[in-house]
Design a protein with these regions (language model features):
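Membrane-embedded alpha-helical bundles that constitute the cytochrome b-like, heme-associated redox core
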Residues: 1-177
C-alpha cells in the first residue's frame, strides 16, 4: 500500500445518513442502557427505561429500510485487500447488520413478555410478537448479552476504519464521511 491515500468511491448520501443516524442511536442506546435502572417484573417502563424502549423502536424502524437499501443499491467498488481481511470485513458487517435487527427484536420480545406497550409515544405502537410470559427476564438477559456482542463488533468496526485511515491509507474511512 502506498503512503498517500487514493480516492475511493464514496457511499451515497442515503447510505451515509442511515449509517450515522444509526450510529448515534446505538451510542445513545448504550449510554441509556448502562445508566438506566434495572428492570424488574412487569412494572411499566418509565424515565430512561421508556426512552430506551422508544429509541429501540426507532432503531428498528431505521434498520429495516437500511437493510433493504443496502440490498437494493449497487455496491460501490471494493478496495483491494488480502482475502483474509476481506473475509473478516464481510463477516463483521454481516454480524453488525444482524445484530442491529436482533438486539431490538430481543428488546421487543422482552417488553412483550413484561406486557409493556412498545412504540413511539402514544401515537405509534408495534404489535405484540409474543404473548406475556415468564421469560421476560431471560429474554432481557439475552438482549443484554447480544448488545455486548454488538458493542464488540462496533469496536472492531471502528478500529478497522481507523486502521484503513492511518495504517493502510486506502481511503476506506473517507467513503462513509
Amino acid at each position: 500500500m502506498s503512503d498517500t491515500p487514493h480516492q475511493a468511491a464514496r457511499h451515497d448520501r442515503l447510505t451515509r445518513l442511515f449509517h450515522w443516524s444509526m450510529a448515534l442511536l446505538v451510542a445513545a442506546q448504550f449510554a441509556i442502557g448502562w445508566t438506566m435502572p434495572d428492570v424488574h417484573g412487569t412494572a411499566p417502563p418509565l424515565g430512561l427505561v421508556l426512552l430506551h424502549v422508544n429509541l429501540g423502536v426507532l432503531l428498528l424502524l431505521i434498520a429495516v429500510p437500511r437493510l433493504l437499501w443496502s440490498g437494493a443499491r449497487r455496491p460501490i467498488a471494493q478496495v483491494e485487500q488480502p482475502r483474509a481481511l476481506a473475509f473478516v470485513a464481510n463477516a463483521t458487517h454481516t454480524l453488525l447488520y444482524a445484530s442491529l435487527i436482533v438486539v431490538p427484536v430481543l428488546g421487543w420480545l422482552n417488553a412483550n413478555g413484561r406486557t409493556w406497550h412498545v412504540g413511539l409515544g402514544s401515537g405509534f405502537s408495534l404489535p405484540a410478537i409474543a404473548a406475556p410470559h415468564t421469560l421476560g427476564a431471560t429474554i432481557g438477559e439475552l438482549h443484554s448479552a447480544w448488545a455486548t456482542v454488538l458493542a464488540i463488533l462496533i469496536g472492531l468496526h471502528a478500529c478497522a476504519a481507523l486502521a484503513h485511515r492511518f495504517v493502510m491509507k486506502d481511503g476506506v474511512l473517507a467513503r462513509m464521511l
